Curated annotation (Swiss-Prot):
Protein task: Involved in allosteric regulation of aspartate carbamoyltransferase.
Name assigned to this protein: Aspartate carbamoyltransferase regulatory chain
Alphabetized UniProt keyword annotations: Metal-binding, Pyrimidine biosynthesis, Zinc
The organism of origin for this protein: Staphylothermus marinus (strain ATCC 43588 / DSM 3639 / JCM 9404 / F1)
Gene that encodes the chain: pyrI
Obligatory cofactor(s): Zn(2+)
């Protein structure tokens, strides 16, 4: 598609391809900025990022998409994405081609990534060397249970307690 002829494609989404990096697709609508937040991407890193929000999706009705050039994800980052956008798909791009495609899966155990909201939980005590420990209780909706105090974190509440 030639950008000068955009009027010929009124219903097309035009975002340039990336040479190397990732495309995070099938993010629930409105969650792309939260995905960038958990990845620690603010815009000042110098990474080229394309963000598309609330586009039509046969699977989800509406979805968000994030493209990040020259970025690849760690297991920790994949786990965090799975907790806030469990329908997401990660496409790894090398030399403009998709070389790997995977759906994210919430981890069954989440250790040290999320702070327990319960202020009396032992994992919140400053002089305790233990890290928070949550067990996946449900995937739809996502629910995590603290293994120390029993507090249950649900859905959108999770992103508020992600450790930075």
């Amino acid at each position: 598609m030639n950008p000068t002829n955009l009027s010929k494609y009124p219903n097309k989404l035009i975002v340039s391809k990336i040479r190397n990096g990732i495309v995070i697709d099938h993010i629930p609508a409105g969650k792309a900025l939260k995905v960038l937040r958990v990845l620690g991407i603010t815009g000042s890193e110098g990474l080229r990022v394309a963000l598309v929000m609330n586009v039509e999706s046969r699977k989800l009705g509406r979805k968000d998409i994030v493209k990040i050039e020259e970025k690849f994800l760690s297991m920790k980052e994949l786990s965090l994405i799975a907790l806030i956008a469990p329908t997401a798909t990660i496409n790894v791009i090398k030399e403009y081609k998709v070389v790997e495609k995977q759906r994210v899966e919430p981890p069954s155990i989440v250790k040290g990534l999320i702070k327990c909201p319960n202020p009396t939980c032992i994992s919140r005590k400053k002089n305790e060397p233990i890290k928070s420990l949550f067990k996946l209780k449900s995937t739809n909706p996502i629910m995590l249970e603290c293994q120390y105090c029993g507090y249950v974190l649900k859905g959108d509440e999770i992103e508020d307690y992600i450790e930075s």
